[in-house]
Amino acid sequence: MRTPKALLLATVALVGVLAAFGETRVEKLADDIWHVRMSRNGEFKGSLIDRYRIWPEQKVVSVGSSLDFGVVRPEARQTEKGFVLRFPLQEGEKVYGLGDSSRETFQRRPGVYDIWMKNVVSYIPVPFAMTSRGWGVVLNTTFRTKFDVGVADRNAMVVSADEGEVDFFVVTGKDYAALLDAYTRVTGRPCMLPCFAYGFMFQANMYADEFELVNQARLFRDYGIPCDGWDLEPGWMEYFYDFTTKKTWNTKRFHYPVYTSSMRKTWIHALERLGKKLCLWLCINYDLLVYEELCAEGKARPSKEKSKNDKAIIVEGFFDEHTEGRFSEKEAIRLDKRTVETRADLALEIPVFRPDNLTGAEQDATEPWFQHLKKFVDQGATAFKMDAGAQVFEWKDRLWAGKYRDAEVHNLYPLVYSKQMYQGFATYTDRRPFVINPDGYAGYQQFSPSWAGDTGGGPKTLVSCHNLAMSGQPHQSCDLDADSSERLHYAFLASWTLQNNWYYHNEPWKLGEDEFASFRDYARLRYSLFPYIYGAAAKAHQRGWPICRPFAFVYPDRPEYADVVTSYMLGDSLLVGVYDEKVLVPEGKWFDWRTGEEVDGPCEKPIVKDARWGGALYVKAGAVVPRWPVKLHIDKGWNEKVELHAYLGADGVSEWYEDDGMSLGYMQGAHSTAKLTLEGSTLTIGARRGEFSGMPAAHDITVVWHKGAKTKAVELGSVPADRDTSVSAPWFWW
């Protein structure tokens, strides 16, 4: 990417035009960030994003009115109720971003994009675009907007809205990495997920009960298939698709005897002992803005409650038929006296959702949504998966918090939902939240990972993931399809991995022999790569970079890579090819993961697939890839035994990252890093920098040397973390 010389200052006439439509205010926030606003009446209202403090607060360096930012000089005007912005585009200028507004394109020029959340076709529209000339723009509005990228005017990106004020940020940078860094400083850095979230999440069949779940967890262990997350779909609820804050368990399937003296004896903790972390599916139709308004007005009291999940908890709504006649009415905990038959048993008869058959719209919403979920956290739930459900519906006659029309709230809703879930869990547990939302808007990367919704795991979801990667969201995934090695290759080499069984029976041991072997091998591969993927996640938090990186991000100066989707980088050093007959190998020396074949790029290589291997995987020469011995589940962000895989043929510098894996300490810098320097045939393991709670004093390290198809492991034994350690490839190996 080349940043041209600063354009000549020529904005006097433009500012004069703008003045006719109201005051223009340009705040410089940093050398690469500006905030532009126009008012109609002398007031700068701000958006609901500002009111609810969703994006980080910014400090103003200086104030002016010029719209010349060197690499771009936009034009702006306010209409009667909305606005029009025009950003000039040069010949050949590429445009990326705009979230999941369309899965038809990756490079966005030419195209017209509707920034409005829609079910299936546009789960996460993001009003952010960046270009190959080194600038980007993000709108600070939640109203519906349109980005016309070189269609109506082939030499411009025209952004318009029927409602809202001119309020946007301009970011500049030498490449897409710098632009995403600036963008996530404006809208918020991506969170790091708890360590287990970078493993594998299994979503059970919706009609499974506690006995089947525990048995399935045992089978994952017995078959040696790594797995951490364990998600229950809506069948866990007493009332199928319960949108209310009164939800409780379907006690026909999930039992809590009142006479137990410890929650450790329940099925949830049996799952926990098998290494599985419980995730609960949620649906919502709650007026989240009521509580946000209380917070904005200083009337809400922050909760000081802390999780009691180490104690015996009997939650209202659980009834044990075995206690009938033996306990008094006060001693027995009974179900609510409802006459409606449990709808989970009638799931197939439930009609397609429409706004008029959803429940919960009239609930008292003065308390935060997360409040009613605390009882489930106390019982052992460690994650929540939020359904698109009512989030994507349009409520034309609804007033949110009694005063805001849906036109202003529709795009905002999933952002507030993720925020309340994230902050609620973090405050209550002092642990990292894992709150998964398929819907989102600008800034949601602070709170939630996303997946491609109810669209499977095919090639179009890959386009979606790349578009989100170029829109500040490093944690994107899709529903794992277990019916081919190609789809397993894609899903297990994503930023995070989940399988949705819904009504199906796709447990690995129910697949064919080849499919089972492929599933297990890919799961083990992912878990062995945990420290490498985790390091990429840390970099995503620190800089806003993707974990799965499109070629356009990594090689911005190579126009031939501008539209590439099926070849991409996983972190700094792994090249993935999927859903294609060939993989593009960039410049340099690379090693085929399976065969060790050395390949000199740039070139194209055919992807050799079979029933157990579904794509390409290459490693860059000069890389040092930290790996773990395969674990069946992950409980912390470090391990005593570590393998450092050094790929000879080029010099390189890599980084080895660790933290405790579960706490929020990483946000205050509680982590350690060590520089891994490969020069010729010598690897230097740098002294560790930083610290975190529980950090080991030393590691048991094995260096595995790779030279073509040859490998040689050298055990270093216990290596102290406080000094440099160098080791060379064995001379007799050459």
Feature map (PLM): residue ranges:
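Bacterial N-terminal signal peptides that target proteins for export
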Residues: 1-9
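Basic/polar N-terminal segments that are highly enriched at the extreme N-terminus
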Residues: 1-2, 20-22, 734
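Bacterial N-terminal signal peptides
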Residues: 10-17
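Catalytic-domain carbohydrate-binding cleft regions of carbohydrate-active enzymes
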Residues: 24-52, 56-58, 68-614
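Acidic, contiguous internal or C-terminal segments within carbohydrate-active enzymes
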Residues: 46, 50-78, 224, 568-570, ...
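Solvent-exposed beta-strand/loop surfaces of large extracellular or lumenal domains
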Residues: 592-612, 711-734
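Accessory, solvent-exposed terminal regions and/or long lumenal/extracellular loops of proteins
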Residues: 622-716, 725, 733
